Amino acid sequence: MKILKIATRKSALALWQSEHIKARLMAQHAGLQVELVGMKTKGDVILDTPLAKIGGKGLFTKELEDSMLSGQTHIAVHSLKDVPVAFLDGLVLAAICSREDVRDAMISQRYVKFDDLPQSAKVGTTSLRRKMQLLRMRPDLNIISLRGNVQTRLRKLKEGEFDAIILAMAGINRLNLADEVAHIYPFDIAQMTPAMGQGALGVEAVDDAQILEKIKFLNDERSVIETRVERDFVTLLEGGCQVPIGINARLASEEIEINAIVGLPDGSEVITENLTAKKSEFESVGKELAREFIARGAKELLKRAEEMANL
């Protein structure tokens, strides 16, 4: 293979991610040419509707997957938190790269800390997971749907539409945005549990031995273990990328620390768990935790959450 083609969304963050993988591939494989093929996904085009109301899985991945299945491209680079837990026939999750900062952060032009936000402050996010946890901490907040790429969200913040917005620290760091805003307040994981796979890049590829061989060096053992726990948890709960589920696993030596939360978008009802498991249990602990949540009513709670989101 002389040319490897990467399917990519056209946002600044998506292009950064694809360029990052392109550079690593070319450094690893002398003589390999790598091209980016830009395209728009459903999630990029429909910007006037909250993601949960658009419905379906793979809002930011389907068009990229179609291009791989048609032979137009060979791989796609995603924020792993946007990658569905099930793959179409002929496609595989070929690599999980080393993780960036997994935390969510409050970005504001006026308020330094989350506790500084005034009563009924306007906070922008389209994520039901973030909304759930924000309202659990501060039921008075006015959570407003905020769509668009990172630059669009920052512009709306600076124009005064919001008192604060919520972004992933990984995106802030990758795009070097710290100097563009006045205040960044990263949430503790116990305050705001991240989405599955948050902070990691996932490389999806056609199920072709030659291509998979070129990609496998990108795998990071720690990230593979952590995200396996997280994705197993979400898979068993049958939760997509747009439901209020937070799950984070952190490998520390021979132990895995896990935080998980499932609940209603308004934060009025939640199921939570914090635990420590052995590293050797990483292939089972995510499923076991999901079964515990199901026994505690998580599936019924998620069904109600979906109904609330579609009102």
From Swiss-Prot:
| Pfam families reported for this sequence | Porphobil_deam, Porphobil_deamC
Per UniProt, which keywords does this protein have? Porphyrin biosynthesis, Transferase
Cofactor binding: number and manner? Binds 1 dipyrromethane group covalently.
Q: What are the GO cellular component annotations?
A: cytoplasm
Catalyses:
4 porphobilinogen + H2O = hydroxymethylbilane + 4 NH4(+)
Q: In which pathway does it act?
A: Porphyrin-containing compound metabolism; protoporphyrin-IX biosynthesis; coproporphyrinogen-III from 5-aminolevulinate: step 2/4
> What InterPro entries does the entry give?
HemC, Porphobilin_deaminase_cofac_BS, Porphobilin_deaminase_N, Porphobilinogen_deaminase_C, Porphobilinogen_deaminase_C_sf
Names of the cofactor(s): dipyrromethane
Record carries keyword Transferase: yes
Q: Where is the signal peptide?
A: none
Q: Give the EC number.
A: 2.5.1.61
**Which residues span the membrane?**
none
Q: Which residues carry this modification: S-(dipyrrolylmethanemethyl)cysteine?
A: C241
Q: Which PANTHER family match?
A: PORPHOBILINOGEN DEAMINASE
Additional information: The porphobilinogen subunits are added to the dipyrromethane group.
Describe its partners and assembly state: Monomer.
- Role noted for this protein: Tetrapolymerization of the monopyrrole PBG into the hydroxymethylbilane pre-uroporphyrinogen in several discrete steps.
Q: Would you tell me the protein name for this molecule? A: Porphobilinogen deaminase
Organism name = Campylobacter curvus (strain 525.92)
